[in-house]
Regions:
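Cytosolic-side transmembrane helix boundary signature
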Residues: 30-67
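Membrane/wall-proximal cationic-aromatic binding patches
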Residues: 84-179, 322-326
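Conserved SGNH/GDSL esterase-like catalytic core that processes O-acyl groups on lipids
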Residues: 159-234
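Short, amphipathic alpha-helical "lid/cap" segments that border enzyme active or binding sites
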Residues: 191, 195, 266, 270, ...
């Protein structure tokens, strides 16, 4: 379990310093060594003396109450965790806004037709969600389905956590290009959930100009979670797979993944991104895979990006961001970072926006 082994089996995470994985593995190694030494030097001698004096059956009978108590403690803990509020969407950092509600198809979605407020980065942010469950300028905003539209899909980076609506990437791109832009992103979504949300929403827009899908290597780990609706083999949409919550907690504390699990996630992610571009082309729209990265990138994130996108032959728009362009106490891009991303997307799409595409201001 050296540094290379950790890089291979512990994926980069947006909200988790990779150094934590190295420390966790180091602590685990020390703990295993200590346990082995204790077993050899202490427990073996005690067990030998106790067996000689009492007999194996007596020892088992004496230990039975403790073992039963341990089993019951695990069972009760599992029940407590299952009855507590538990959802993948509540990944750190936890925020009460924008408010989420259960969705039988996608797992969760924004609560439609409301506005909520939350302090983020020292600012009071208004999160307005329209009747279609899309973040917008106000709850009463209604996109014109007949207007030329740029559709953005993804998760909280696109939804604009910590940003006022005009500061979000979709709003900035729409303003710069003078066309309607709509966000169908939902906080906490993995790539496959974002794609399914896009498939639900895209047919409603009669004149899509472009489809922009976010992909971040630091969020790839979400694509391997199965305790939510997800794609199985062959891009078959499957319901959440029941799992022990205690096992999930342990995995999140030590997020080890096997080579096979990671490879399956790579193949699924490639297929979803290719399908996104194909769906855009089928509607006569320009497809863009948007990949903002904070620099310098972690080596593991670079390797993952190249493995999924470059080796997969998937074109993408890479937007480097300064590490300081993060919301205070949070990992999301701040207004400076969002502005740089918005400028890059607008520049990428400008050649594909026909003259007189403006219909009315974006939602």
């Amino acid at each position: 379990m050296n540094h290379a082994w950790v890089d291979r089996h512990f994926l980069p995470e947006f909200f988790r310093d990779h150094a934590l994985n190295l420390r966790a593995v180091l602590i685990l190694r020390i703990g295993l060594v200590a346990l082995g030494v204790a077993t050899i030097t202490l427990l073996r001698r005690w067990a030998a003396r106790a067996t000689a004096r009492l007999g194996a059956l007596s020892i088992l009978m004496a230990a039975a109450p403790s073992l039963l108590a341990l089993v019951l403690a695990v069972a009760v803990s599992e029940i407590i965790v299952r009855t507590a509020a538990w959802r993948v969407a509540a990944e750190a950092p936890k925020t009460p806004e924008p408010q989420l509600q259960a969705d039988p198809r996608l797992g969760w979605r924004f609560t439609p037709g409301r506005v909520g407020y939350w302090i983020k980065g020292g600012r009071r942010i208004a999160y307005a969600i329209d009747a279609g469950g899309r973040r917008a300028a106000s709850p009463s905003s209604r996109p014109d389905m007949n207007c030329p539209t740029i559709v953005f899909a993804g998760e909280s980076i696109i939804a604009g956590v910590g940003l006022q609506w005009p500061e979000t990437i979709p709003a900035q791109v729409g303003q710069r290009l003078g066309v309607q832009s709509v966000s169908v992103a939902v906080n906490g979504f993995a790539t496959d959930q974002a794609y399914m949300r896009l498939k639900d929403q895209l047919p409603r827009f009669h004149r899509p100009l472009a489809v922009v899908m976010l992909f971040s290597p630091a969020l790839f780990w979400k694509n391997l979670q199965v305790d939510r609706p997800h794609f199985g083999p062959g891009l078959v949409w499957q319901p959440a797979r029941p799992t022990l919550r205690l096992t999930e907690i342990a995995h999140r504390a030590v997020p080890y993944l096997s080579d096979a699990e990671i490879e399956a996630g790579v193949q699924m992610t490639r297929a979803v991104l290719r399908a996104t571009l194909a769906d855009a082309r089928a509607r006569g729209a320009e497809g863009v895979i948007l990949t903002p990265v904070f620099t310098p990138e972690e080596p593991g994130a670079v390797a993952l990006r190249r493995r999924i996108l470059d080796q997969g032959g998937i074109p993408y728009l890479l937007v480097p961001l300064d590490q300081t362009w993060r919301i205070q106490g949070d990992g999301h891009p701040d207004p400076r970072g969002a502005r740089v991303v918005g400028e890059a997307v607008a520049a990428r799409l400008k050649p594909h926006i026909p003259p007189n595409s403006a219909c009315r201001s974006g939602s």
